[in-house]
Curated annotation (Swiss-Prot):
This is Cytochrome c oxidase subunit 7C, mitochondrial. GO terms for cellular component: mitochondrial inner membrane; mitochondrion; respiratory chain complex IV. It is a single-pass membrane protein. Its main location: mitochondrion. The lineage of its organism: Eukaryota, Metazoa, Chordata, Craniata, Vertebrata. The modification N6-succinyllysine is found at K25. Pathway: Energy metabolism; oxidative phosphorylation. The chain crosses the membrane at residues 35-57. The keyword Manganese does not apply. Coiled coil: none annotated. InterPro entries: COX7C/Cox8 (IPR004202), COX7C/Cox8_sf (IPR036636). Belongs to the cytochrome c oxidase VIIc family. CDD domains: Cyt_c_Oxidase_VIIc. It comes from Mus musculus.
Length: 63
């Protein structure tokens, strides 16, 4: 009995909560400013691409 009432309460709380809906609202970053998004994506993908080269350079220069 207690478990059912707790389950009903938690599901009703979830149903009553409201989040913004629409394209880009469910992402962990903003897509409103396209230039900021471009810079963030360049840094993100660029760092992933450049990391192996810097690691190899570090290993070659190490004595």
């Amino acid at each position: 009995m207690l478990g059912q009432s707790i389950r009903r309460f938690t599901t009703s709380v979830v149903r009553r909560s409201h989040y913004e809906e629409g394209p880009g609202k469910n992402l962990p970053f903003s897509v409103e400013n396209k230039w900021r998004l471009l810079a963030m994506m360049t840094v993100y993908f660029g760092s992933g691409f450049a990391a192996p080269f810097f690691i190899v350079r570090h290993q070659l220069l190490k004595k």
